[in-house]
Amino acid sequence: MTVLNTTDKRKADDTVNKLDGKLKQPRLDNFFKTNTSSPALKDTQVLDNKENNSVSKFNKEKWAENLTPAQRKLLQLEIDTLESSWFDALKDEFLKPYFLNLKEFLMKEWQSQRVFPPKEDIYSWSHHTPLHKTKVILLGQDPYHNIGQAHGLCFSVRPGIPCPPSLVNIYKAIKIDYPDFVIPKTGYLVPWADQGILMLNASLTVRAHQAASHSGKGWETFTSAVLQVALNRNRKGLVILAWGTPAAKRLQGLPLKAHYVLRSVHPSPLSAHRGFFECHHFKKTNEWLEEQYGPEKCINWSAVSEQKAKIKSSELESSSTE
C-alpha cells in the first residue's frame, strides 16, 4: 500500500520524500550514541523549560475546590492520576456532560465488571509522554482485553506477556527499515513512550474479554480532545502514525496542516500483508524528526530491545487480580 502524507504539501514532506528515494537502509546507531529509557514523569518533577515550569505550577486541588461533592467523586481518578500538563490542558473537558456521563458509566462497570487496564494505568500515557515532550502520535483503537495485558499504552503489553500478533508485525516492519534492529522478546513499549511517542487508544478502557465493549461511551470524544490539544500546542509539527481505517477516521476535522501524517493498513495479521511491511513509517518518522528538530530528537526504536524490563511487584499484583 502506498503511504499517504498529509494533504498539505509541506516543504518538510518534500524533503522527506526526496530522502526516501535516495537514502540507503540506515542503521539505528546512525541516529544514536546511547539512549536509555527514563521512568514515568511524576507531577512533582521539575520540567525542563520555561513553558513547562509554568505548566507544572497548575494546582489540581485548587481547581477541584470548585467541584460539587458528586463531581469530585466522579473526577477523583483524573485528579489523582492524570499528569499535570495534560490535566491543565484538558480540564474543561472534565465538566462537560459527556465526560461526567462516561465516568458514571465507569463507576458502575468497576462495581460489577472486570475492567482493563487497572484504574491507575488508564492515564499512564500522560506520565510517560507529557504534553511538552510529545513529538509522535501513535493511534490505537481499544485496550487489550485479556488478563495482564493492557497498561495504558496502545499496542504495548506488560513485561512477561507474549507479544500480540500486531506488535510482532510492527517489529518486523522496523527490521525492514533498520536491518540491525534486534526483534525484542518483550512487548513492553514504555521506552518508546518515554522518548515522546504518545501511544493513545481511541477508547481508554474495556470490559474483560469483550472487545470494544466501552466504545461509544465517551472516550472517543475525550481522546479526540487530547489529539486536538497535542496538535495545537506543537507549532513545529508532530508525526502522526495512523494505521487502519478507524485511525484514519480519527484525524477527520483535526488541524493537520503543520504535521506529518503517515497512513497505512493496520499491522494486524488480517491486513498487514496489504502494505504495512512496505510503508517504511519508522524510517520516515526519524527522517522527518531529524529534518525538523535535529538528529537528537529521532526515536531509538531499539530502546525496547535494550531495556532491562523488570516486572514491578505492583504490576505482578495487578496482573494477578485483573
UniProtKB/Swiss-Prot annotation:
State one Pfam family annotation: UDG
Q: Which GO terms describe its molecular function?
A: uracil DNA N-glycosylase activity
Domain of life, per UniProt, equals Eukaryota
Q: Localized where?
A: Mitochondrion; Nucleus
Q: Which UniProt keywords apply?
A: DNA damage, DNA repair, Hydrolase, Mitochondrion, Nucleus
Q: Which reaction does it catalyse?
A: Hydrolyzes single-stranded DNA or mismatched double-stranded DNA and polynucleotides, releasing free uracil
First-tier enzyme category under EC: hydrolase
Residues at the active site = D142 (proton acceptor)
What's this protein's family per the entry? Belongs to the uracil-DNA glycosylase (UDG) superfamily. UNG family.
Q: What is this protein called?
A: Uracil-DNA glycosylase
Q: Which organism is it from?
A: Schizosaccharomyces pombe (strain 972 / ATCC 24843)
